[in-house]
Amino acid sequence: MAADEARSVSRLHSEEDMHGKHHSTLWGDFFLHHVPCRPGQYLIMKDNVEIMKEEVKKMLLDVGSSDLSHKLDCIDTLERLGLDYHYTKEIDELMCNVFEARDQDLDLTTTSQLFYLLRKHGYHISSDVFLKFRDDKGDIVTNDARCLLRMYEAAHVRVNGEEILDNILIHTKRQLQCIVDDLEPTLQEEVRYALETPLFRRLNRVQARQFISTYEKSTTRINMLLEFSKLDFNILLTLYCEELKDLTLWWKEFQAQANTTIYARDRMVEMHFWMMGVFFEPQYSYSRKMLTQLFMIVSVLDDLYDSHCTTEEGNAFTAALQRWDEEGVEQCPTYLRTLYTNIRATIKAIEEDLNFQNNKHAKLVKGLIIDMAMCYNAETEWRDKKYVPATVDEHLKISARSSGCMHLVSQGFISMGDVATSEALEWASTYPKIVRAVCIIARLANDIMSYKREASNNTMVSTVQTCAKEYGTTTVEQAIEKIRELIEEAWMDITHECLRQPQPKALLERAVNLARTMDFLYKDADGYTDSRSIKGILDSLYVHLID
């Protein structure tokens, strides 16, 4: 035991460890002192928003008797501005009316918008609605940029086997790329954003922040809606900052007591952003804080098993977590005993909070930590044996689950209280197809961006290496291209499962939001590990109010 501890201490001093390979926090104590607006200003904003909410509700009642195109535009605008969460019932009623009127003789632009919104809201609508627009060669031809954009967005809610949507996606993407530089500035901005991230895959707050600026330039804007969206955005930003103040205090104490700074990434603000991507609404403030705490612990465990502890230490620590008692950690070195104590203290505090809220699922929280530790420990066996799985599917059986997404969905449901039933939690724990698809997107997107770094760190082989082995590709680029195809298939599975609606829409939306968050974080870089790549976005969501 003494020799084991001595070896651990020696390693801490002799290695640069993870802290030397990843940049330090970009935020530090920033949110302990950052106050976006004065309390009086905040109350005035909330009062004004309540007035505007009622005005928009009246507007929606009027829209109910308007033509189909106007209904679609109204819903689309509210969703892009990030205001739709205030009007779930009203929009559901409008979408029901839209579905009943879907057989009208519509032009291609309106048909595309109709198709996109119905699919997004879980309605079954056949892609055959596009057949009538094909020419003699079987192509759908248009030179209208706005129409191309609508078609492009519609094609991104396809499911497997929809050949017409596959073709629409290929052709509209190619055409939009060709004409984007020649479009007028506002439309050009929309097209470039869509080519980077299609509408269905965008994060609510990121999309709202971007579209508010676009909408402000529109000659057809409704000024009250613009002002409403700005105030609502600023109110949520202020709430997020209050949460980050509390979380900063917790994280500073956890780091100091558990001494994780020497090997673990310090990404608490980025983790809050991750959770906010899944639960952005104000009523889920506790969900964001609880999940940020839980998954910061998961992040520490990821780094611990990945690059810091020995195999023997990992085995002992995993066994201790499985026992979950004071005696279980006695065989571990001092630094792991300290970490163990602080993990249990955080979990106990969360359980007490949930019990106080009369949440009957509090006892399930610690299972996240235990299961993630077991996943990470299993991965070290592959690493130590230098084993390369024969197929991507074999790899994903372990690595997709270790992405933590399955656990985030389950723990997210727990944090929602009565919104999630015991049946919903049981369903989530069976690793249903939609959750598996989210996990696959997370794992594959992460591996694409982290492949080079992790290949040089002697960590577990990634799906990139496994894909190259399975398909006999000669270059990393070819393997990555194949992996991108698998990601697209996973998105199609998500759309398909949302159309089946095995669970309430409010719960399915959390899984979709998680996929959107993973898409954002790993689109151009590993945005969690190298959070400098998303610093500008975080500034716009947490620091700067909209004037």
Curated annotation (Swiss-Prot):
One of its GO terms (molecular function) is terpene synthase activity. Pathway: Secondary metabolite biosynthesis; terpenoid biosynthesis. Optimum pH is 8-9.5. Keywords: Cytoplasm, Lyase, Magnesium, Manganese, Metal-binding, Plant defense. One of its GO terms (cellular component) is cytoplasm. Gene3D superfamilies: Farnesyl Diphosphate Synthase, Terpene synthase, N-terminal domain. Induction: Induced by Diabrotica virgifera damage in roots and Spodoptera littoralis damage in leaves. Accumulates upon stemborer Chilo partellus eggs deposition in some cultivars (e.g. cv. Braz1006) but less in others (e.g. cv. Delprim and cv. B73). Its main location: cytoplasm. It comes from the Eukaryota. The Asp-Asp-Xaa-Xaa-Asp/Glu (DDXXD/E) motif is important for the catalytic activity, presumably through binding to Mg(2+). Belongs to the terpene synthase family. PANTHER family: (E)-BETA-CARYOPHYLLENE SYNTHASE (PTHR31225:SF158), OS04G0344100 PROTEIN-RELATED (PTHR31225). More abundant in insect resistant cultivars (e.g. cv. Mp708) than in insect sensitive cultivars (e.g. cv. Tx601). This is (E)-beta-caryophyllene synthase. It comes from Zea mays (Maize). The lineage of its organism: Eukaryota, Viridiplantae, Streptophyta, Embryophyta, Tracheophyta.
